[in-house]
């Protein structure tokens, strides 16, 4: 009787399976997440402060780390974050750590301001069975609205018309 009354609530907190093939239950998921998020925040320091990637990673990692520190229960962590199971969050955190290493290696923010990229144009004909996904013409209402905005702002922006070849393409 005692075990039924006390044991059941304790057993309810133990996750038996993730329900995702190949994704095993992590019994100490909270501790693993806290460790991974802390490592992520240390690793991202190598990325320049003004980079959007660093700002985004720091922002969501800090938020997730705070939730993990505030909540003891894995169910509450999953509920508050709303990003899947804790095991999925662990995989995401590991992937983010790997990506940070790659980003530091690739150094995409180290491109000089005067760098010019070579544009390669391919004039080969496109086979008929390949869709070209060209957007259709803009509706007349778009041009009316644009002209109204230009008239209101009273700037010297030339009015756009449907006959402009740049706007039709």
Swiss-Prot record:
Cellular component annotations (GO), alphabetically ordered: mitochondrial inner membrane; mitochondrial membrane; mitochondrion; plastid; respiratory chain complex I
Main localization, broad class: mitochondrion
Keywords from the named record: Electron transport, Membrane, Mitochondrion, Mitochondrion inner membrane, Respiratory chain, Transit peptide, Transport
Membrane topology value: Peripheral membrane protein
Domain of life: Eukaryota
Location of this chain's protein in the cell: Mitochondrion inner membrane
GO BP annotation list: photorespiration; respiratory electron transport chain
Family per record: Belongs to the complex I NDUFA5 subunit family.
Subunit record text: Complex I is composed of at least 49 different subunits.
PANTHER family noted in UniProt: NADH DEHYDROGENASE [UBIQUINONE] 1 ALPHA SUBCOMPLEX SUBUNIT 5, NADH-UBIQUINONE OXIDOREDUCTASE 13 KD-B SUBUNIT
Function, in words: Accessory subunit of the mitochondrial membrane respiratory chain NADH dehydrogenase (Complex I), that is believed not to be involved in catalysis. Complex I functions in the transfer of electrons from NADH to the respiratory chain. The immediate electron acceptor for the enzyme is believed to be ubiquinone.
UniProt protein name: Probable NADH dehydrogenase [ubiquinone] 1 alpha subcomplex subunit 5, mitochondrial
Organism, scientific name: Arabidopsis thaliana
């Amino acid at each position: 009787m005692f075990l039924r009354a006390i044991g059941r609530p304790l057993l309810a907190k133990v996750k038996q399976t993730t329900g995702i093939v190949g994704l095993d239950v992590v019994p100490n998921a909270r501790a693993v997440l806290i460790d991974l998020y802390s490592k992520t925040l240390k690793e991202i320091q190598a990325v320049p402060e003004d980079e959007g990637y660093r700002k985004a990673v720091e922002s969501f990692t800090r938020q997730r780390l705070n939730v993990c520190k505030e909540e003891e229960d894995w169910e509450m962590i999953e509920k508050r974050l709303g990003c899947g199971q804790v095991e999925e969050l662990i995989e995401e955190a590991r992937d983010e750590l790997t990506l940070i290493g790659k980003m530091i290696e690739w150094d995409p923010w180290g491109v000089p301001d005067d760098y010019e990229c070579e544009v390669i144009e391919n004039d080969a004909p496109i086979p008929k069975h390949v869709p070209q996904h060209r957007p259709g013409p803009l509706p007349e209402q778009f041009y009316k609205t644009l002209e109204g905005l230009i008239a209101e702002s009273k700037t010297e922006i030339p009015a756009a018309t449907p006959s402009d070849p740049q706007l039709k393409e």
